[in-house]
Every structure is written in structure tokens, then in C-alpha cells.
Amino acid sequence: MSYFDISGATFNEQLKALETSDPCHADVFNALFRQLINNDVALKEAVTNFAGSKNEQALFILNLHKDGKKYGVHFDNYDVTPSSKGTRLFDAVGMTAAPSTNTVRAVNDFDGKGCFAYLEVNGSVDESGEFQVQYIKDIDNEFSRTKYDTWCLYLTQYVYRKFDSNGEDTVISDARHSAEWLPEGCAIRPDGTIRPFVAIAKYMSGDNADGIASSISGVSPKNYSFQSALTKFRTKGTQYCAETSQDSERMTRLMEIAFATRNSQAVMSGCNNWWYQYAATVQETDVERIIISKSNANNLVVGGTVSIGNATALDSNGKPNNDRGYGGLHTKANKVRITKIEAYDDNNTAVYVDNGGQKFSTSPTTVSGVTCDTVISTMPWNTGSCDDVLGSCGSPISNTSGKEPYILFGVEMSSGFWEPKGNTKQIVWLFSTGKEPYICYASVYLL
């Protein structure tokens, strides 16, 4: 059968008729259309000629990747085999995947295949909960990762799960093969109908130039609680919230099936070992760098986000309070990028930062007669730190250092802090020890 979806497109009537009157030749056309994927100029021309609205254009491109195949993985129960490694199933058998870096494009056989294929777009969610594409990467010159909310669009997953005494199978496809194959949660509308594609924000939320929560590259991710995130996102519209449980579930499936493991940190660790604070060992003025000991500098990474400043309060023991929650730790350089790390002398290393040309001093200050050294503090990575990764998955320099975020099929994650689920609450009942989690499928109803 043909997997090319022409619904809503503007083909001439003869080409449309092939889908029902001559499916064999329709498949020939499908194969030709799939060749467009590797020809940017031809793809741009075809999209603008064959599809009308931006949503239709996006679906046109995604459907070029549609293959109807089944990609699966089996994990043994612990009492069968206490291993995090999985066994590939169905069409995933024989496939391989490895994460890339900024300098190495690794082999990932899942790239561009069915549910693993993604399309970067600018867009928004309207008041009815429907995603509206504004610009498409490599199609529209207006597309921007820094000006407009950036998302990754995927074909809707249909999921098959099987549990038995040996373990569990998880299989996904872009086609529903039987009633046992259920649509992913992201794709289910409140009325029960199924969306043809799902949108996942590419970046953690940070403020744009107007102070609006945005999925854009090059900003500092904001620190939110469940409630403060909901309040902030409601300024964008009633259908916005932080990352949902369904978002997380979808990306977890992609990780487990593509890499056939539940030990995700063995593949891409993410930023979970990045909590350093070091005092200046050499004082300078009018600089955009801080000099620290050589051994301490070895723990830092070019591209990482840091703040530089001095304590403005003392702790209960009368010592400088270097808690990152205090503003003084960010006064000289606030969540800026490390641009270079180079030797200063035999014992010390200079760590350069991009502070926008604003120079500072690394001399100590005083609080109530107590000397407060200038310190550099690691912070969650700014968004867009993985923009130069050469593949669909991977970290900038090292995938397993524990100091860097990564992208997983286009979505940047694990930037160095916890991320509460934006549509999930746990209710603790009065006069009871019971707790119940609740997931909301329509953000407009979140309180």
C-alpha cells in the first residue's frame, strides 16, 4: 500500500486519482517523492507547489519519511536477566545507533526513519490546542531558532506493548497495524481524535527579549516550580504548560528503541556532574576571564554555562554564603558561556567567558569584615548548546562526561537541573496515606 498522504494537498486530479485507481503506480510516485528528502532545492519547490497551508507542508515532508515499519525492543524482567540491555525486535533488528558530537557524525540507522524522523519548525499552539506551523527549517527563509518558538514535529507514534513472565516488548510504528496498537498520548485530542503529528519544544524554556517564555536558542533556562511555570506559560495562551508526561514518555521510547538500553547514561549521560565552585587564585581587573587552579579548571568544559561573582552574605558560621540562589554570585558575569580554557602558568589556568564585552574584576570583596573571594559557579547550560552537534542525537564534546546536555532526535535535554512535569499532579488525600497521580490532557484545565 502507499504511505504517502495527499489529504489536503493541491496535486492535480490525475495524480490524486492514482492513490485509489492505480496504487502500484502511486507507490512509484511515493519512491520518487522520498528522493526529495536528499535534495533541498527540489524539496522546497515540491512542498510549496504540492501543499497549501504550513501545517499541510509540514505533514507533506513528514510523510516522505513514513514507512509503516515496526521498530521494537525487548527488555527482560530482572529475575530473568538483571541487565539494562535490550534485544531489538522486528524492523529494528540489525540496526545500530550511536550519538554524535560537534566534530564526529556517528552512524544512526534510525535517522529519518518513520517515527524517528523530525522536522524543525517555528510555530505555536492555538486556543483549541492545535499546533500551528509558522515557518519550516530549510523551506522558509524566515525560520529562526533565536527569534521564534522552535519545535520538533514527529509523525504520530502507534505503540504496541506486551508484558509476560520473561519481560516486556515495546514496539512503535507510524501506522496502526491492529487494535492493539494505541496512539501515543501526545497525539490524543481531548475529544479522542488523533493528531497526524505531535510537536515537542526543542529547547528548555527561557525568556525572549520581551520576557516571554520561549523555546529559543541562546538563552538561560528559567527556574520554575509546577505552579510558577503554569503561571508564566499562561501568558502565552491557555494551552501551554511545561514538559508533559506524554512528552517524556515519547522521548523515552525513542531512546530505548534506538539504543536498545535502559541505561541511557551509558549512551548520553547528560549534565548531572556539573556543580563546581572555584575561587580565583590570581586577581585581575578589567577582564572577561577568571584564573583558577589548574586542577580545578580541568573539571570545566568549553561551552558550559557559568556565573562569576562574590558572596554578599555570610552563613550561620560566619563564612561567605556561596549559595547560587544569592544574586551576588552572578553580578560580574551572569550565566555566560565559557569560550576558552588555557594555561596561565604552571599551576593556574585562565577560564574565558563571553560577557558581552562587559569587563570585571576578580578581586575579593568584604562582608562584615569577612573576605569574600570571587568565585566561578557552574550553572545549567544555556539553550542551543547542542546546536552544532552533527547528528540527531549527541552532546557537543563528550557524550559520557556527565557535564554536557544532549539532543535526542532533535530535542535538547538534560541541561543540568530537574524538570517537573507540567501536566501531572500527585494528590495526597487528607486522613489517608494514599497518593494518586493525575495527568491532564488539556492544559486549559490545569490549576
Enumerate the predicted regions with their spans.
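Beta-strand-rich, repetitive solenoid scaffolds
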Residues: 25-31, 35-39, 394-399, 410, ...
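GGW-centered surface loops in extracellular recognition modules
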Residues: 55-155, 160-162
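Carbohydrate-recognition beta-sandwich/jelly-roll modules
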Residues: 97, 101, 136-139, 146-192, ...
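Extracellular "spike/adhesin" assembly and maturation modules
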Residues: 1-48
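Hydrophobic beta-strand signal
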Residues: 16, 307-308, 419-420
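C-terminal, surface-exposed recognition/capping segments
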Residues: 61-63, 69-80, 375, 392, ...
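Glycine-rich, low-complexity segments
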Residues: 38, 42-67, 245
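Short aromatic-cysteine micro-motif
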Residues: 141, 145-149, 177-313, 318, ...
